[in-house]
Amino acid sequence: MDRRRFIKGSMAMAAVCGTSGIASLFSQAAFAADSDIADGQTQRFDFSILQSMAHDLAQTAWHGAPRPLPDTLATMTPQAYNSIQYDAEKSLWHNVENRQLDAQFFHMGMGFRRRVRMFSVDPATHLAREIHFRPELFKYNDAGVDTKQLEGQSDLGFAGFRVFKAPELARRDVVSFLGASYFRAVDDTYQYGLSARGLAIDTYTDSKEEFPDFTAFWFDTVKPGATTFTVYALLDSASITGAYKFTIHCEKSQVIMDVENHLYARKDIKQLGIAPMTSMFSCGTNERRMCDTIHPQIHDSDRLSMWRGNGEWICRPLNNPQKLQFNAYTDNNPKGFGLLQLDRDFSHYQDIMGWYNKRPSLWVEPRNKWGKGTIGLMEIPTTGETLDNIVCFWQPEKAVKAGDEFAFQYRLYWSAQPPVHCPLARVMATRTGMGGFPEGWAPGEHYPEKWARRFAVDFVGGDLKAAAPKGIEPVITLSSGEAKQIEILYIEPIDGYRIQFDWYPTSDSTDPVDMRMYLRCQGDAISETWLYQYFPPAPDKRQYVDDRVMS
């Protein structure tokens, strides 16, 4: 497994993997698509043509690593790269009357070495023209780029694209596709956070992880006044090709993406990840090990939320473990899942650089039957916030063999809150700390005599108020150890209930402890299910060290 080290930020997700052989696969046509910056020959294009291209490409050998960049681009620093600006006067839809959306392209350079081809499509005639790279599309400012090295490099291509929405045209983008098959979007805060990918391959296997590339995009010319646009993408890698259609709705408070893909396997694939997403979790209310900074919490997402095919809602708080962890949650035709950032309180982060309280959640809603499979969650140890250490995706149960073809349809919601909510009580927060004493009576003279770990899980909403007089019962299941000192506490400031228990080990094992809990009233579940993974310390660390100096 290749533990990717992508640098966080819109300019810092380096692309890896193969080039595309699409040049020989285009059909010929005689008419032009309408775009002032498109300068290539006309060719007919629609989604069925793209599917045929991806299918035919899968029958050919993958072309391997990208070709070298001109020296002036290959040696760029991140600061120099970020100073390059696309000329807004030459944006893709600059001349569309009453345009509400516009698109610009990212320059090649630094870690972005894979050429991405761009095409403008007239949706009325289905005719496309390529947009070739030329230096006059960009403003180089203080980047120190030797533009003479770029003259005549019309096949250099671009690194990706981003889309702007009125009234912030050319100022604040709302959608970005940059690096391999990574893409992101924002909600009404305009703050980027976690990323999605076109596909994940061998994320957690004994093989090196493979990162497919989007190697070409086709943009339907946006309609006047429209806030929805359609872009098509060709995906290519050593093991698979794919045709993608993104219908992207840039709404006032969220971005919604309707995604349809058709995939064609070149090789057998051990682990195929559908609708993958990548996030960061360094520390939070439940995981304090790496919180030795001025910030109480540091994370893009605080939980994995799952709405299972059987209707069960699950909340799985994220971790920053000391050792890489991968968990797979079995399901059949899942209703939805996502990495959520539900804590939106600035005081819980105190971060005026990262603005983690403004980062969007990402929810996946399958639009066709996905069948049996698992939702995979990988958590990688990190010492800070510059590593995306959380990966989540859907893995079909059926093994992928060379020559297989399959299609998935799903909707992505980039928003502060997911589009659907558990009607039962929901987990608001998870906290852990020292146990072994009555709540409110942490001894000041000495530590508790017996070591234990306390867990406090806050539930809000649902029918908790109605259930309280009848009796609320926490149902706790542990893979090892035992739960004691179980308490149910009403928390007035949140108008919810805290379930608190102490975990005591029953062996010397340091294997992760899988915890499961939900609330029940008169035999009926009244909350979503809380899942947690705790990593007990070694036996010789299960003691409290009194380091006070009393004299």
Curated annotation (Swiss-Prot):
GO annotation, cellular component aspect: outer membrane-bounded periplasmic space
Compartment(s): Periplasm
Gene name, Swiss-Prot/TrEMBL: mdoD
Pfam families: MdoG (PF04349)
Organism domain of life: Bacteria
Keywords, ordered alphabetically: Periplasm, Signal
Function text: Probably involved in the control of the structural glucose backbone of osmoregulated periplasmic glucans (OPGs).
GO BP field: beta-glucan biosynthetic process
GO MF annotation: an example: carbohydrate binding
Transmembrane feature ranges: none
Pathway connected to this protein: Glycan metabolism; osmoregulated periplasmic glucan (OPG) biosynthesis
Signal peptide as annotated in the record: 1-32
PTM info: Predicted to be exported by the Tat system. The position of the signal peptide cleavage has not been experimentally proven.
Xref: HAMAP family: MdoD_OpgD (MF_01068)
Family recorded in the similarity comment: Belongs to the OpgD/OpgG family.
InterPro entries, alphabetized: Gal_mutarotase_sf_dom, GH-type_carb-bd, Glucan_biosyn_MdoD, Glucan_biosyn_MdoG/MdoD, Glucan_biosyn_MdoG_C, Ig-like_fold, Ig_E-set, TAT_signal
Primary localization: periplasm
Protein name: Glucans biosynthesis protein D
